[in-house]
């Protein structure tokens, strides 16, 4: 699957450079990204829980002229190189501030829905390699991800509290375990 991601990134780059049809490879790239069995996310240094080695997905404004973006990687090796290159690691250098979310059993669609609800407008895909900026609304449209609701993973206890309080839960990312650096 990662080969198809690279293929569509290359086709998109060629189309963009030659003023060709960029829409088809762009949409196919978005579909292939969403088909991956696991996606890697840069995690926030600000929300890092040192005791549990967890953090939440990073939304950064360092690229796209300050536009908030969710940092996503299709490959763990590329993500690890990015973490080391930017020193986006724990202080002891044992972990990169990177986490993996499997498509199954919970599906990672909630991360994209949550990121959009929290203000992300872009997806920075594979920074540090042949990166691509993806419009998050377009990504959700192409992959039939609802923009009208947000899927949230709640524990049974959290669900009981929401029902008892009769108000919606706070929209927030859930902590993701860090991956040890190789």
Each predicted region: which residue ranges?
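An interfacial alpha-helical scaffold signature
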Residues: 1-182
